[in-house]
Amino acid sequence: MRKRTLVSVLFLFSLLFLLPDQGRKLHANAEESSDDVTDPPKVEEKIGGHGGLSTDSDVVHRESESMSKKTLRSNAEKFEFQAEVSRLMDIIINSLYSNKDIFLRELISNASDALDKIRFLALTDKDVLGEGDTAKLEIQIKLDKAKKILSIRDRGIGMTKEDLIKNLGTIAKSGTSAFVEKMQSSGDLNLIGQFGVGFYSAYLVADYIEVISKHNDDSQYVWESKANGKFAVSEDTWNEPLGRGTEIRLHLRDEAGEYLEESKLKELVKRYSEFINFPISLWASKEVETEVPVEEDESADEETETTSTEEEKEEDAEEEDGEKKQKTKKVKETVYEWELLNDVKAIWLRSPKEVTEEEYTKFYHSLSKDFTDEKPMAWSHFNAEGDVEFKAVLYVPPKAPHDLYESYYNSNKANLKLYVRRVFISDEFDELLPKYLSFLKGLVDSDTLPLNVSREMLQQHSSLKTIKKKLIRKALDMIRKLAEEDPDEIHDDEKKDVEKSGENDEKKGQYTKFWNEFGKSVKLGIIEDAANRNRLAKLLRFETTKSDGKLTSLDQYIKRMKKSQKDIFYITGSSKEQLEKSPFLERLIKKGYEVIFFTDPVDEYLMQYLMDYEDKKFQNVSKEGLKVGKDSKDKELKEAFKELTKWWKGNLASENVDDVKISNRLADTPCVVVTSKFGWSANMERIMQSQTLSDANKQAYMRGKRVLEINPRHPIIKELKDRIASDPEDESVKETAQLMYQTALIESGFILTDPKDFAARIYNSVKSGLNISPDAVADEEIEAAEEPETSEATETKSDDLAGGLNIEAEPVEQQEENTKDEL
């Protein structure tokens, strides 16, 4: 009985479905036979599933079959674009936009404009917002994979019929621009306009576009175009009323299928529109587990005949009594709901006093995509006012990227992002921060920055220069403040008070950490940025002969200078350990002078640009011109060693030695070699010789003249003076003088051009010390006679020979002995 009832019910349902289907077929046949496309009938069905474009609160109906053909409606008013479409599309596709992704940025930007407008009007008239869902200021994105439609909807001010014709039918005309002209004296409109062609970027991915819009002062209209030179506008009588706002439907090209993926849309919103003022939501899918009733298996009907009558009766009785408990099971089900995509708050719009440290840290991790637990070393949040207004947040990362300096001049670091009214513009340009500050991460949001027709190509405008100047100053102030707040940077006379207070414990050692990570960038800034050279010099840190392994600054160095000291002394080399043993420091250290150690290769270039600081000149102690006070015996010593210096200079004429002088920098070493004031130091020569593409001719020119300085108090120099006085032609004295010069070259950090000659002189000196004749040579090697063949082979041959001649073979040793006897 139950089986027959079920069959009857199914038959009735099939009849109900067949009747509407016949109606649809008749309607389709009528369309095919008609030359003109008729308006689609109004559809009352709500679409809330994955393929639909509506929800319970926001219902938009599917298109009719005629719309799927992407043809203009027959009853619509037809217009032609005022600009040639071929030229328009050429500008949009080929000239303005380097990638298709930004179409979504442009449409969301326009939606934000519309929301800004209605919000501004609502300040004086709250009724313009309406009620319910219409009053929500939001942007919604939906996709229909089956029909390849992407929809972007806003609840903004909307457009009238006239607005649609004027703003979307004319190139370089923007509703926002007109609105600004109308309201510019009423306050801050906070609009993103000025373009007029942003909407047309949608044709990069779509070949047919519908714009459905409803303004409070007009009916709902549809604008549609295939970008073939024509567009149409008609009153909308078939779509669900929007209430207020605009919906743009993009019928995507076949090659633009990637924009029907939820992940792609999320990525684009995250990249370009993350900080738009209004919520941006995507109708997204997700899997959830739900409990559903366990349905009877299809095989249950087949097994009914075999079940016992008693079981059927019992089952019927249970059903009648309602005592049967329904079984359920868990299944995975795909559901759709609105997912908020821009949940990161734009903290730079708030006052810095209102933002907590935790919020700054969280925003840094979101901005930099660095999701470690490390906090940024420092940050600067500020608002700039004046001719160019902008807001910015700058961060010093906790660590430097491993490849920060590997491709310094060729890299395009995406660390500073430019926004215009919360719309992402670009992160690949050098107009806002110089290369040496490229390690900073942050964001700049300008309200007044003028742009050209494309958001991707910034104009070379004075506004950019103004922003850059302010950003650099704020960045340097942030780094300077980091140093000032570090207890390790405080002078000794102030340390006791700080230690007692116990403040800034978290900031202890922070600037040392910064210097170890980014110190080279400060040095590069001194080289590249002449305008801020003095500010950057204050940020320099280095070790000295008196810093006990700690970093010190130029200001601290000057505070410790001797009263008679006029110059800032420094020395360059490959390591601190090497420099501490340098002969150039001997007399300076004994007299209590402090010398700066520069051990980074970039320091050589740095000191070519940093000539002075606070009216103090820099003096490389390995170059000529060092002044360390006057010695009362200087004139007397010069006169006493005049003959030696003159003789020595003559003997070194072939060695590119410009002069031989009495030294004022030596204490324990007999002599050193110094370079001319503007020539390369020994360390610079070493650096340049290691360059793969170095020019040998340029090296010879830049090497300059060398000066041999002798220590008149050293016993070797005194002895040479006496020897020269007695016999200036003594070959042994000449040999010793040459050896002394070569040794001084090595100790001064230079690389010998003829190490073989130097080695020969050393060996001769050793011979002399061991009382070995200078003419003594190594014994010649006695050439051994050619070794005979192996004994086994010889014995074998001897045995063969003996066997052949029937004689007894002699041992090999005996044969060799007999040969010697014969000789």
UniProtKB/Swiss-Prot annotation:
Induction: Seems inhibited by heat shock.
Entry keywords, A to Z: ATP-binding, Calcium, Chaperone, Endoplasmic reticulum, Glycoprotein, Nucleotide-binding, Signal, Stress response
Family matches, as Pfam families: HATPase_c_3 (PF13589), HSP90 (PF00183)
CDD domains named among the record's database cross-references: HATPase_Hsp90-like
Region forming the signal peptide: 1-23
Primary location group: endoplasmic reticulum
Source superkingdom: Eukaryota
Glycosylation sites: 110, 452, 620
GO cellular component: a single term: secretory vesicle
Biased composition (Acidic residues): 290-321, 777-792
Tissue occurrence: Ubiquitous.
DNA damage listed as a keyword: no
Annotated region described as Disordered, given as residue ranges: 29-60, 289-328, 777-823
Location within or outside the cell: Endoplasmic reticulum lumen
Chain positions recorded as ATP binding sites: 106, 110, 154, 159, 167, 173-175, 194-199, 246
Similarity-based family: Belongs to the heat shock protein 90 family.
HAMAP family membership: HSP90
PANTHER family found in the cross-reference section: HEAT SHOCK PROTEIN 90 FAMILY MEMBER
Protein name: Endoplasmin homolog
Lineage, broadest ranks: Eukaryota, Viridiplantae, Streptophyta, Embryophyta, Tracheophyta
Gene behind this protein: HSP90-7
